[in-house]
């Protein structure tokens, strides 16, 4: 066993995290759910979503059988909604292809929708006693700093080198503890900013610490200015309820409920009338800016006071009581707009 692995395992046993809800099980459904939720989302945010999700959908079969809207509602607020759509598709694929039993081989797990190599390996390691390296964001940061790896970790050549290094460092025993130690170290000590090098078990061999480069490594992705987009959304209100539509499965907020988006160049009042509304008044609300990974969106909501739409379901729309905003499957910026009403 390498000194790197030995130090990490010793540290994990005494200083690592042992009380997270997904650490108390080897059920691949629950481990997989935690791995997907933890992608680009911190533990403190994930934990209540994880527990609530399992309370409603305690088994993979429950998830596979659930309506899409229920899954999206449970995910609402976590962001990166493609994860929820892939999660649902993956559960159905396990039922259809594997009789409802999660496959045990990493390659078979990675062939499922929304599961990449690192997530597949983590599931196999924690649930089926496999011996496979992982390479999530925390592990990349630890390896880049400890071994002085140059370049952006997401670049193909750098990522290939990191996979090779991760495989070479993998111990022959206590793989689960080692994998957990890497993730714990990156999440608690070897953080993106202000790492706690004084408490790190790898401090003596860490290149970044020795050279004073912990803020520099791993190197960031070359930044580009985010493109700017605008969209006008109709807030059609009839008393204490608002009119919503379901977004198409693909694209931003796919599958979620949202305010009707106004086609480019369309007049808000006329568009509301085309939906069957009797328009009483129209007023513009304050804009809201929301940053996505690849662009910034300025939402320009327009409040349309109207009388009830008689046949909303016939045109793909539905009414939602304002009292149900918090529990509905709404994108965060749309929920913020409605909370201001």
Whereabouts are the PLM-identified features?
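Catalytic cores of DNA base-excision repair glycosylases
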Residues: 2-215, 226-228, 277-278
């Amino acid at each position: 066993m390498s000194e790197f692995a030995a130090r990490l395992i010793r540290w994990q046993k005494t200083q690592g995290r042992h009380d997270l809800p997904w650490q108390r099980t080897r059920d691949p459904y629950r481990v997989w759910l935690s791995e997907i939720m933890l992608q680009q989302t911190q533990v403190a945010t994930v934990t209540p979503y994880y527990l609530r999700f399992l309370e409603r959908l305690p088994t993979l079969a429950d998830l596979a059988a659930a309506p899409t809207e229920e899954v999206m509602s449970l995910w609402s607020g976590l962001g990166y909604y493609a994860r929820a759509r892939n999660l649902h598709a993956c559960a159905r694929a396990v039922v259809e292809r594997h009789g409802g039993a999660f496959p045990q081989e990493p390659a078979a797990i990675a062939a499922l929708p929304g599961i990449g190599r690192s997530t597949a390996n983590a599931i196999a390691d924690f649930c089926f006693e496999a011996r496979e390296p992982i390479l999530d964001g925390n592990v990349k940061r630890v390896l880049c700093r400890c071994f002085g790896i140059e370049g952006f970790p997401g670049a193909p050549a750098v990522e290939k080198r990191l996979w090779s290094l991760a495989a070479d460092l993998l111990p022959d025993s206590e793989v689960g503890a080692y994998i957990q130690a890497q993730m714990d170290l990156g999440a608690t000590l070897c953080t993106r900013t202000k790492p706690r090098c004084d408490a790190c078990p790898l401090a003596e061999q860490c290149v970044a610490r020795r050279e004073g480069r912990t803020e520099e490594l791993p190197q960031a992705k070359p930044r580009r200015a985010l493109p700017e987009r605008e969209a006008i959304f109709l807030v059609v209100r009839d008393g204490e309820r608002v009119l919503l539509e379901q977004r198409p499965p693909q694209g931003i907020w796919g599958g979620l409920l949202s305010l009707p988006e106004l086609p480019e160049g369309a007049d808000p009042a006329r568009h509301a009338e085309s939906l069957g509304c009797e328009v009483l008044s129209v007023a513009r609300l304050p804009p809201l800016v929301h940053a996505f990974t690849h662009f910034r969106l300025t939402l320009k909501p327009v409040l349309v006071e109207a009388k009830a739409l008689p046949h909303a379901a016939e045109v793909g729309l539905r009414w939602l009581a304002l009292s149900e905003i918090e529990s509905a499957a709404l994108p965060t910026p749309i929920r913020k707009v409605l909370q201001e009403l």
